[in-house]
Swiss-Prot record:
Name of this chain's protein: Protein GVQW3
Gene: GVQW3
Upper lineage: Eukaryota, Metazoa, Chordata, Craniata, Vertebrata
Transmembrane stretches, start-end: none
Pfam families, sorted: HTH_48 (PF17906)
Gene3D superfamilies membership: 1.10.10.1450
Organism: Homo sapiens
InterPro entries referenced in this protein's UniProt entry, alphabetically: Mos1_HTH (IPR041426), Transposase-MT_Hybrid (IPR052709)
Length: 254
């Protein structure tokens, strides 16, 4: 219970002893506490209780889990839990810490300044310490499997997204340079892969993982051609072939 409400209940009890009516008591509280005054219904309810002989100004004991407050200890517990797993819901955190959901929600919102983010955004977010190491590992893979010129010429970023109901063997791919907005080039010359992709500039999210795994397979060849206004990129390994399709990039003149 808030301290200011406890103080107002004591004031109501004092007004009852002075034989003040419920309306007069509410008017006096409104003048004294302004916007923080208790509601009219609550003032009348407590006025009636004290008039009937009640002495205790605190709430009656309730069954169930006790209500907890936003103490420093609880705030630290919520912070540690949400940092260990950011996919937990408010309900799951409340059950884990044995707190009520409203307390957890207020701690997240007011004390930790956190808010819910769509899962579509979270899928591409890495921990603060991950991008550097992932970028370095991806660059090592590129250098170890291809000529040195590949790492020196790469200057873009790959991001991939899937249809809601993707067809087998077909994916939407978005090739875009992070610095200039250009579409990265993909081609194959005598079995050697060349792509404008760099682990240094990329944000190294989930699509980059997929790219590294994709190109780390055995010998494969990739060719591209334009048909019906779409860019088709074909990757084949022996008798197997995977088809990637992308809408043509529209250049905007500034």
């Amino acid at each position: 219970m808030s301290d200011r409400y406890l103080e107002q209940r004591i004031s109501i009890k004092f007004c009852v002893k002075l034989n003040k009516s419920a309306s007069e008591t509410h008017h006096l509280l409104k003048e004294a506490y302004g916007d923080e005054v208790m509601s009219r219904a609550r003032v009348f309810d407590w006025h009636k209780r004290f008039k009937e002989g009640r002495e205790d100004v605190r709430d009656d004991a309730r069954s169930g889990r006790p209500v907890t407050h936003r103490t420093d200890d609880n705030i630290q517990k919520v912070k540690d839990l949400v940092c260990s797993n950011r996919q937990l819901t408010v309900r799951m955190m409340a059950e884990e810490l044995n707190l009520d959901k409203e307390t957890v929600r207020l701690i997240l919102k007011e004390n930790l300044n956190m808010r819910k983010i769509s899962a579509k955004v979270i899928s591409g977010v890495l921990k603060e310490t991950e991008p550097h190491y992932v970028a370095q590992a991806g660059l090592e893979l590129l250098v170890s499997r291809d000529p040195p010129t590949l790492a020196s010429q790469s200057s873009g970023i790959i991001s991939m997204s899937h249809h809601a109901k993707p067809k087998p063997g077909v994916q939407w791919c978005k090739f875009q340079s992070e610095s200039t907005g250009r579409r990265a080039r993909s081609a194959d010359v005598q079995g050697q892969e060349k792509m404008d992709v760099t682990a240094q500039e990329a944000r190294t999210n989930l699509p980059f993982y997929l790219f590294v795994l994709f190109r780390s397979s055995m010998n494969w060849m990739m060719s591209m051609h334009i048909r019906e206004g779409c860019l088709f990129i074909t990757r084949s390994t022996n008798s197997n072939a995977n088809l990637f399709r992308k809408h043509p990039h529209r250049h905007t003149q500034k």
